[in-house]
From Swiss-Prot:
Purpose: Component of ribonuclease P, a protein complex that generates mature tRNA molecules by cleaving their 5'-ends. Also a component of RNase MRP, which cleaves pre-rRNA sequences.
Compartment(s): Nucleus
Keywords: Hydrolase, Nucleus, rRNA processing, tRNA processing
Pfam families found in the cross-reference section: Pop8
GO terms (BP aspect): intronic box C/D snoRNA processing; maturation of 5.8S rRNA; nuclear-transcribed mRNA catabolic process, RNase MRP-dependent; tRNA 5'-leader removal; tRNA processing
PANTHER family: RIBONUCLEASES P/MRP PROTEIN SUBUNIT POP8 (PTHR28173), RIBONUCLEASES P_MRP PROTEIN SUBUNIT POP8 (PTHR28173:SF1)
Reaction(s) the record says it catalyses: Endonucleolytic cleavage of RNA, removing 5'-extranucleotides from tRNA precursor
Gene: POP8
UniProt protein name: Ribonucleases P/MRP protein subunit POP8
Additional notes on this entry: Present with 4870 molecules/cell in log phase SD medium.
One term of GO molecular function: ribonuclease P activity
Main location: nucleus
Disulfide bonds, paired cysteine numbers: none
Enzyme Commission designation: 3.1.26.5
Amino acid sequence: MGKKTFREWQYFKLSITSFDQDVDDAHAIDQMTWRQWLNNALKRSYGIFGEGVEYSFLHVDDKLAYIRVNHADKDTFSSSISTYISTDELVGSPLTVSILQESSSLRLLEVTDDDRLWLKKVMEEEEQDCKCI
C-alpha cells in the first residue's frame, strides 16, 4: 500500500476587484481590507461556523492575495468567497473576489519572479514546521 499524505493546508491565490477600473485604480487594497472582506464573506455564508475558519495570509500585493486555509475548511472558504459581494463600505464600491488558483501544494502556486522571495521563505518555514511534527 502507498503512503498516505496528510494535507494540513490548502493554498489560494485570490484577486479582488470592484469591476470599476476607476475605483480599482484609486484604492490600494491592504491586508486589513482583505481580512475584513474575507471575514464578512465567511460570516455571511456560514455564520459563527464561518467565523471559525482558520486562514492566514502568505502575501498581499494590492489586488492579489495568497492565502493558506486549513484543509478541512477549504470548501467552506472557497464557497463563501465565490458567492459573496461586499457592500460599498470598504472602498465606496462593492468588491468581489475571484479564485485564480487553488492548490494543496505550496510548490504548485503560480507566482511572478517578484514573489519568489516570500514564497521561498514560506516554504522554508513550512519545512521547519514539518520537521517539528
